[in-house]
Amino acid sequence: MQENVLTGKVALITGGARRVGAEIARTLHAQGMNLVIHYRSSRDDAHALQAEFEKHRPKSVALVMGDLLKVAQLPGIVEEAVAAFGRLDALVNNASSFYPTPVGAATEEQWDDLIGTNLRAPFFLAQAAAPHLKKTHGCIVNIADIHADRPIKRYPIYCAAKAGVVLLTKSLARELAPEVRVNAVAPGTIMWPEGEAEVSAAQKQEMLARIPLQRTGSPDDIASTILFLIRDATYINGQVIAVDGGRTVVA
């Protein structure tokens, strides 16, 4: 494998300031990439991450704030990313909303939020980024979910949005080839959700019992798969890679 093949290349990571997004950023930066980290409300986390990375490599991280629900802002996010370093080699559509919307209680606002962050924003960001990625023969990595085709109760809108991400990934892979590769990662249980989607200890045990490896994954499992798709997978296009400890092979 060629060493430092990513040095000087540029990745835009949405929702890159915390949780899995921060680990993706950490992994790509360690491989020599310059980063544009998008955030909406995690300003302090974003600036802390930038400071951490730039101790090792000054002027290697730019930050861009934006609301992914506002489609008119999305081309500007991409343009800021390109302006920061003069090129764009990878778009990682990581940002996501996740919470229950049981039938009978779901609202139009929840629909707009879940579809907007998980499906609409990745498409319009990809559309804006495509001309720049074609110039560099770059790639797009979307974040799907193993529940895109194995829906979980009480999450119909989220599951529908992620199902859309799967087909969007395959469609973009055809639309943007041969210059741009488009793939997706479908996480299983990686980090326990926060806030409204938080699960009980009993629910955690029930979920773990269905995973052949009998444990959760880590953010590094997702980040290393994304690194593989960006750096090494030059002949992989239109694929969705499950990172789930074997959950999808269990009935």
Explain the meaning of each model-derived region.
Residues 2, 150, 210, 227, ...:
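Short C-terminal tail/terminal secondary-structure segment
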Residues 10, 17-19:
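Conserved glycine-rich cofactor-binding loop
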Residues 102-103, 107-115, 196, 203, ...:
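Substrate-binding pocket helix/loop in short-chain dehydrogenase/reductase
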Residues 126, 161, 169:
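Active-site helix of classical SDR
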Residues 131, 173-178:
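Alpha-helical segment proximal to the catalytic Tyr-Lys
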Residues 177-181, 236-238:
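Short, small/polar-rich loop/turn modules that mediate ligand/substrate recognition or access, typified
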Residues 211-222:
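A conserved structural motif in NAD(P)-dependent oxidoreductases
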